[in-house]
Amino acid sequence: ITMADNYIERQQEQYEARKAAWKQAQKYGKKKLTAVRPAESKSHTSTVSKPEDSKRRVFITGGAEGIGKAIVEAFCLAGNQVAFCDINETSGQETAKATGAMFHKVDVSDKNALENCMQTILAEWNDIDIIVNNVGISKFSSITETSVEDFDKILSINLRPVFITSRLLAIHRKKQPSPNPYGRIINICSTRYLMSEPGSEGYAASKGGIYSLTHALALSLSEWNI
């Protein structure tokens, strides 16, 4: 289990360069891609090819827009089998059409809806190799103007789904007679878990929770190769 910080946004240039290289390779019928490093290291390139047996079954939360959409695109670009969920149906359908990924409209704060989504995917794929817990919202406001309901809403979207998806995958793996030797859960954290600012109590608490939860999950889920 690993955590991804907001550096993903700063890596966008690297991703766009790799995407452009892939499109060029498709245009000229090449089978290998040139992986371009970030701007400060553009002089260093390497050839990357992806073996067929390394394709994975990937589930991403909050994949319709922004960072989530870029994650969906990247996994699809690498030839993986991808499913994602999002509450925004219009953007979700557009991303699914553009990438070929499977889209599920889900409000992740609804425990039953999120669990049903994962159960549907598990029934179709038999297992999930990679989960990316990306979904998240932020609301920065004075603590005197932030209601308890506002605080709870942020945690129900940012933090609780990390536990729900991880727990469900563990339950599924525990039932399998032959354990899957591969498993990864990537949780999107933030520098705000440690470097907060006024009015960010809900967001900071959710990201701090993800940071701590990831450590605990890493110990608990290692039994099932996650």
Residue positions per predicted region:
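Active-site loop-to-helix junction immediately N-terminal to the catalytic Tyr of the SDR YXXXK motif
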Residues: 146, 195-204, 216
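Residue(s) in the substrate-gating loop at a strand-loop-helix junction
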Residues: 190
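Alpha-helical segment proximal to the catalytic Tyr-Lys
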Residues: 171, 219-223
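Active-site helix of classical SDR
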Residues: 166, 206, 214
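Conserved glycine-rich Rossmann-like NAD(P)H-binding loop of the short-chain dehydrogenase/reductase
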Residues: 78-93
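Substrate-binding pocket helix/loop in short-chain dehydrogenase/reductase
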Residues: 142-143, 147-155
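Canonical Rossmann dinucleotide-binding motif of NAD(H)/NADP(H)-dependent dehydrogenases/reductases
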Residues: 53-81, 217
